[in-house]
C-alpha cells in the first residue's frame, strides 16, 4: 500500500494558489484513476483506489499547511505504514517552474508543511517536489506561494498534473528516476522545458 499526500490549504480562497499544487495533483489522480469519492477522515479528505495494481490512499490534510503532519501521522498510524510507503507531493520554490524532482528525506527548505510532517513522523519519507519558481527576493516568497498561478502559467501546470497522473504507476511502484524522467519528457514535448534538461538533479 502507498499513502499519497498532497499539500495545500483548505478553502476556495486558496484553491488556485501555487502552494496548493499538491492538492491539485491528487484531485487529478483521483479523477483519472477512478478513485472513490473524497470523504472526511484523518483530519483531512481521503480517496481510495489502486494504481498499477498497488492499493493507494490519497490524503489532502485539512489542517492548513503548517499542521499537515497531524493528518499524515493519523493516516500512517491507522494503516501501519513505514516512511518509504508515504509519498508527499508539494510545491517547491527552489526549483524553476515546470521542473520536478523526487527525493527521499533531506532538508525542508523552509516549507512549513514538510516541517510539520517531519516533526510528526520523521524525515525519511519520499517527496515529489513540484517547481513553482522563486520570486527572486526572500520577502516576496509568502505572497508568491499564496497567490494563484498566473494565466500564462496554467498551460504548464495542466501539463505537469497530466504527466504526474499519467506516470503515477511508476511513482507508486518506487521507480522514482523513471517517473521523474517521464514527467520531464512530457513537459519537454510540450515545450515547457528545454531539451537539454534531462531531469537529472
Curated annotation (Swiss-Prot):
Signal peptide per UniProt: none
Biological process (GO), any one: rescue of stalled ribosome
Main location: cytoplasm
UniProtKB keywords: Cytoplasm, Hydrolase, RNA-binding, tRNA-binding
Site note Discriminates between blocked and unblocked aminoacyl-tRNA, residues: 9
One Pfam short name: Pept_tRNA_hydro
GO-annotated cellular components: cytoplasm
Catalytic activity from the UniProt record: an N-acyl-L-alpha-aminoacyl-tRNA + H2O = an N-acyl-L-amino acid + a tRNA + H(+)
Residue(s) at site: Stabilizes the basic form of H active site to accept a proton: 91
EC number assigned by the record: 3.1.1.29
Compartments (UniProt record): Cytoplasm
Recorded family membership: Belongs to the PTH family.
Assembly behavior: Monomer.
Function in brief: Hydrolyzes ribosome-free peptidyl-tRNAs (with 1 or more amino acids incorporated), which drop off the ribosome during protein synthesis, or as a result of ribosome stalling.
Protein name as catalogued: Peptidyl-tRNA hydrolase
Gene: pth
